Amino acid sequence: MTGRIAIVTGGTTGIGLATARALIDRGHRVAVGARGAATPAVVAEVRKHLGAEVVVDRLDVADRASCDGFVARVTATLGTPTILVNAAGIYREAFLGDHSEEDWTDQIEINLSGAFRMTRAVYPAMVAAGWGRIANIASTAGTKGAPGYAGYCASKAGLIGLSKVTAVEGAAYGISCIAISPTWVETPMMTNAFHRIAARRKISLAEARAEIEHSNPQGRIVQPEEVAALIDFFCSERAPGFTNADVQINAGADW
């Protein structure tokens, strides 16, 4: 397959960074965006992992102008993007009685509305090209209730719904869309969660990690490269019928 132009949001760490690496290895030209991507230190670190040719630019998916401007700059620099991976995401932990409206809004704006803004920004070019692939990083939390994560669960449930609508509407134009719903993944976000769990329950980080590892049948934590491998397959010519799906990478856990 001829290399295509890909955008990966949240592409400086975790699942986004691993996905960018997989797409580059497949021959695609990749632009990664994140809120902290404008600093020279972040650009240098990302290029150490992905190579000097990758485009690294600031992107705030909570801001429509930032999304539109990012896509315009990528188009001018690399060409028309026909692959979009919405990996930008945050979480805020609080039980309903203590969940602030600000934290709720932040999660919806970044995890759900951010994916909508980026999809809307690239969609016309994908329609014109007659080909497009959009992968949205959701979560098993989008289909299961996780106590203390109301905003996160709601945003990921919405993202699964957005993915299905995008798949149905885009099918006539050669555009496929899936949601990918991992369980716990070895990322900086997960590390932060371990610290919060350990502090709340007054246990060590090692104990917090062990509890999560043993909460699924495989007894381990999913690696970001596993998610990236699925996205790589989805974006290939080997999977034309792979769309309108919520694919769980859950290490066997039914939650």
Residue positions per predicted region:
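Residue(s) in the substrate-gating loop at a strand-loop-helix junction
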Residues: 139
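Short, small/polar-rich loop/turn modules that mediate ligand/substrate recognition or access, typified
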Residues: 171, 176, 242-244
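Substrate-binding pocket helix/loop in short-chain dehydrogenase/reductase
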Residues: 95-96, 100-108, 134, 212
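Alpha-helical segment proximal to the catalytic Tyr-Lys
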Residues: 124, 168-169, 240
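Active-site helix of classical SDR
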Residues: 119, 155, 163
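Conserved glycine-rich cofactor-binding loop
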Residues: 5, 12-13
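C-terminal substrate-recognition "lid" of short-chain dehydrogenase/reductases
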Residues: 116-117, 131, 218-249
